[in-house]
Amino acid sequence: MTPLYQLTVAQAREMLARGEISSLELTDALLTRIAAVEPKVRAFLVVDAAGARAQARAADARRAAGDASPLLGIPMGIKDVISTQGLRTTCASKMLENYTPVYDATAVARLKAAGAVILGKLNCDEFAMGSSTENSAFQQTRNPWNLERVPGGSSGGSAAAVAAGEAPAALGTDTGGSIRQPAALCGITGLKPTYGRVSRYGLVAFASSLDQIGPMARTVRDCAIVLRVIAGADPFDATCTDYPAPDYEAALTGDIRGLRIGVPREYFVAGMQPDVEAAVRTAIEVLREQGAEVCEISLPHTPYALPVYYLIAPAEASANLARFDGVRYGLRVPGESYFDELERTRGAGFGPEVRRRIMLGTYALSAGYYDAYYKRAQQVRTLIRRDYQQAFEQVDVIAAPTTPTVAFKIGAHTDDPLAMYLEDVCTLPLNLAGLPGLVVPCGFAEGLPIGLQLIGRAFDEESLLRVGDAYQRVTDWHTRMPEVREDGSA
């Protein structure tokens, strides 16, 4: 029998529905798994064992009473930038080390209403700023495939937990690739929905025009199940659209014959690891063999996406993080005056990467530089969005690499912020355009996973899920799980 911690969401749902296992048994199995591997992987910042068991018992009682909610009794983890009532939400920052929200984010509330069991909060880069989870103020999450490598970021804890069998699914957030990049590096499936598909209410904001909550799991089907629960209009988020959430599972037909898939030449960047490019191109050929029509396309403004992103995102972050001043909540360091106290508090509360982005954003918004930097970046953002609009007049889905390399060693880019920023070169253009992106495992190099990225039209997650599911029906990359060893190897 498959160990319970290896079950996918869909498998667990079926076994729970048939009465073969209880939610409490499943939750206990995962808590046991967490206890066994967490000292090595370090994906969780908070494990709420007592709360999870109580929720599992409640789920079993609901099922006995005839409830058949879509996630009833399914344990999940939550990235620690998403508010959870009564459960510490730190954003992996000293600034919010002891902050406990008094309300749930809309996405979390919807998970709970659907019967999900919340196992705890998952590590991330501080305030979701980073690509390796090395910027967490509390601990370094490690890639379960090789404990000397990063899991990616900023949703590194979410990706590592799913890959290591500590949770069948988790919520992550994606501002410039923070669901897709760690999903690729940890060998799991991750979906960044269209901007506005999922409510951001209760998400601690990094860059408000870019942030999006999405599911991370082992299979496309699991992501479809979770997305249907968390998607939809929310009166608490004016940027959340009122488009009805379709039945995403119904889109998983396995048939992609005649679907037009474009391959953008600009995504195969200079310096890309040859094995990564080969794996992605092989995966695209698999889609061709399944009946898809594949052609090369151009997204000419893609090379400008990186500098545009690193003007717009820090500018929004500098405004959003101004609220953390030590006056109303969070860390407070006494000073001789209000301004001295503010300087001491923010200096002690924010890590170096957060401070760097605040300074960069403040500069971009300052008088005399606004037109030259921020305004011009927004103009180029429009051109990037237009590139995608024109491409989708020719194709239905775009297929591309997710990362230029496999997971790098912990500490490899610590002293080189630009090298770290380049890790997101294939993912952040989607955020600027507000489009959905799906990552599925498509191979290995150096014993480390590689991810294929699928990009769709706005609010057409169904096509992405259909293509990703079709790919997973004829490949087994997504079924492979790492064996976490003491020596840091896989």
From Swiss-Prot:
Q: Which InterPro entries match?
A: Amidase, Amidase_CS, Amidase_dom, AS_sf, GatA
Q: Which reaction does it catalyse?
A: L-glutamyl-tRNA(Gln) + L-glutamine + ATP + H2O = L-glutaminyl-tRNA(Gln) + L-glutamate + ADP + phosphate + H(+)
Q: Which Pfam families match?
A: Amidase (PF01425)
Annotated active site: 79 (charge relay system), 154 (charge relay system), 178 (acyl-ester intermediate)
Q: Which GO terms describe its cellular component?
A: glutamyl-tRNA(Gln) amidotransferase complex
Q: Which UniProt keywords apply?
A: ATP-binding, Ligase, Nucleotide-binding, Protein biosynthesis
Q: Which domain of life is it from?
A: Bacteria
Named from the GO MF annotations, one term is: glutaminyl-tRNA synthase (glutamine-hydrolyzing) activity
This enzyme's EC code(s): 6.3.5.7
Q: Does the keyword ATP-binding apply?
A: yes
Q: How does it assemble?
A: Heterotrimer of A, B and C subunits.
Provide the family line. Answer: Belongs to the amidase family. GatA subfamily.
Function text:
Allows the formation of correctly charged Gln-tRNA(Gln) through the transamidation of misacylated Glu-tRNA(Gln) in organisms which lack glutaminyl-tRNA synthetase. The reaction takes place in the presence of glutamine and ATP through an activated gamma-phospho-Glu-tRNA(Gln).
Q: What's the protein called, per UniProt?
A: Glutamyl-tRNA(Gln) amidotransferase subunit A
Name of encoding gene: gatA
